[in-house]
Amino acid sequence: CNGCGTCVKVCPQMILAVTEDKKMVVEDPGRCMSCYGCEDVCPRDAVFNKKALLPDTRLEDIETEQTRPIEEEYDVIVVGAGPSGLGVAISCAREGLNTAVFERLPNRRVSHHTDGGVLFVFPGAATIKREGGVFELPEHNFKMTDGFIHSEMEWLTLDGPGGYRFDDRFLKGMTGYCCSKDKFVHQLADEAEKHGAKLYYDTRVKTVKREGERITGVILLDGTEVRSNVVVTADGVLARLSKKTKIILNSKSDAHVQYVTLEYKRPEGLKSGFSFMMGDLPFEDDTVKALPCVGIGSHVEVSMILHSKTKFYTLNKPIDYWVKKIAKTDKRVKKYLGDHLDSLELVAVKGTRLRLRELSRDNAVDGAVAVGDNWVAGAQLGNVSSLANGLFAGKELKKAFERNDFSKGSLSSVSDFITKDMVKTIKQTEKSMLYPVVMDNQTLLKYFEIFSSANYPTFFYGTKMQISMMMMGIMAKNIFKLLAYPKIFKYL
């Protein structure tokens, strides 16, 4: 640490400081949301946020899981024990490959996911089948018990300014699920171990090991070198290790995003569902662009996605202050939670940082591949699609072992998972999430006036034909209004 203070400027909770002897200190550890922003921006790689810090009620969740000794060499090393990384581990291990997973978090009980626990899947990624207590992805020959699923969703919507909102009903044939993100990852970890994968928690990978241009393993934070034929980077949206492998991740950064979630215990009597809320925000500065969310699943979650053109935190108060203010004052939140919020028990504060970037299908180099959220924009792949991505990648890696060829050309078939339909849908999803950024409140109001009859669950769970027919009907009915507002028409 050289005392530059970059970490202080980026912290959305405003809990960091630099001492006179040029050392970073955490002044209020209990409020850390573990977004790892301080690590991400440190020019000297001097910051290591070892554990996800949670309120005292969940101190047991940050106990370090005991693991076996690390071997000198594996067939496959996976970095990151999220859905995509564990999908790779499951697929490789059941094919008989000696597979290790290195995860920086302390144990499998903490997922670090900030989203609302909604299960959905992009076209071409997988098909969810649930029957008799079993969760299945038939295309990927994957089954496990569905104990992580909390309930079927009863509503899913987009709330706009002025009381406008999209139709939230699940139409016939459409089913959405609310899940426990922690249980989902926990079960995947158990499944990977059942097939023979070796999981190492509280183990941080510092960089990759090279012989010439080929990746030949990893170097851990303590300097331990571990060899492998293939390294799989599944290190999430910031993709720190992917960059060190020189896998080409599009560097275009349209926006920096800070995403924080306050997670509460769920009381009885609430209906399961999720809403994004656009416009009508409490900020005095109308240039602030944010997207609050409220979700009711295994927990009650109130979140905010803050967009910025700079990597630094720009609001005048900590980000959890603004989320709590939205939770207490926004009528849209009260509509879903009633008077429960004042009595809810806070379980965790979780956060992450994203960079919006264009999709990249070039996710392989000699000896390494990237999977999961590090090749998409804004962490939009979701739990199930990420798992499917990992399962698919594992099968392709088995073929590379059969060829005994770990060159970029041999490993590049991993990118065949990314279909044209998937790319199109992800781009459309990102565009809709950027509406609060590109539209002022007046334009948003007009947008919702025109499109509030749209059925929001159809966007997630409908067929391409259902989505197209719905949108064409709405646009035909409102063609003159759209022509009168060219900004909306052009953006659509």
Positions of the model-derived regions?
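Iron-sulfur cluster-binding cysteine motifs and their immediate structural context
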Residues: T6-K23, G37-L54
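N-terminal Rossmann-like FAD-binding beta1-loop-alpha1 element of flavoenzymes
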Residues: T67-V101
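N-terminal FAD cofactor-binding segment of flavoenzymes
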Residues: S91, R104-T157
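Predominantly flavin-linked oxidoreductase catalytic cores and closely associated redox partners
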Residues: L105-N107, E191-V333
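Short beta-strand to alpha-helix junction loop
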Residues: F170-E191, R240, F312-K317
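FAD/FMN-dependent oxidoreductases across multiple families
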Residues: V205, F312-F392, E396, F401, ...
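Active-site-proximal substrate-binding core of FAD-dependent oxidoreductases
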Residues: K395-L444
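C-terminal auxiliary extensions adjacent to catalytic cores
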Residues: Y435-L492
